[in-house]
Amino acid sequence: MSRVLSRDQSREVDQIAIEQFHLPGVVLMENAGRNCAELIRQLSPAGQILILAGKGNNGGDGFVIARHLHNAGLNVKLLVFANPEDYSGEAESNWRIITAMQLPAVSNATAADLSQALAELPESSLIVDALLGTGIRGQVRAPFDEIITAVNAYRDDHPHAIVFAVDVPSGLDCDTGLPCGVAIKADQTATFVMLKQGFVTGDGPEYTGTTHVIDIGIPPALLDRLTAE
């Protein structure tokens, strides 16, 4: 079995799990987010947990993480760098849960909202990067380039803070291991199913920090078939 997955293989894993193994996408997202939340709890952040959610399923993972950490009694704040009306599928379903729970969240967040949230963070807080997923290639566009730069600057100035990346540090090409202009420098990366190719190539190790492979319920037979090809 291969030790790593490429971008295309990662996409294929999800597609086969849903279409051939009849695993609903919302179940995979729930497993991913719940297990990330459990890992975050094990890291025992003493301050606030600030979750940065982007568009698409990476943001949806962030919503699941926010819900489970909030339910566990942790101090959670959510910044959503997207218009919630643009969410669809599993991400939309989980955003509806967030709004029904009235969890502290700022939608249509801006770089100014991030600056204020970072300024208000207590020491030893944890920042969850659920901005951009494995599909990123080319150059990171506005406003995410500015957001990533601000998070990295905060990390440099606050050595007791933890930056926790969901699946892949935002802006890191998961095939080449090179930043797409800019990329989150994570202390911890929780990646789904298997390590990504870019974690062990290029500059990947400089951006991922400590890596953890998260089980999202993919049948071993699927992985055996895919990685044998």
Curated annotation (Swiss-Prot):
Binding site for K(+): N58, D129, S170
Record-level Gene Ontology MF annotations: metal ion binding; NAD(P)HX epimerase activity; nucleotide binding
NADP keyword on record: yes
Gene3D superfamilies, A to Z: YjeF N-terminal domain
Disulfide bond entries: none
Binding of (6S)-NADPHX, residues: N57, N58, G59, G60, D61, G133, T134, G135, I136, R137, G138, Q139, D167
Stretch forming the signal peptide: none
Pfam families per the UniProt record, alphabetical: YjeF_N (PF03853)
Cited function: Catalyzes the epimerization of the S- and R-forms of NAD(P)HX, a damaged form of NAD(P)H that is a result of enzymatic or heat-dependent hydration. This is a prerequisite for the S-specific NAD(P)H-hydrate dehydratase to allow the repair of both epimers of NAD(P)HX.
Listed NCBIfam families: yjeF_nterm
Name assigned to this protein: NAD(P)H-hydrate epimerase
Species: Rubinisphaera brasiliensis (strain ATCC 49424 / DSM 5305 / JCM 21570 / IAM 15109 / NBRC 103401 / IFAM 1448) (Planctomyces brasiliensis)
Gene of this entry: nnrE
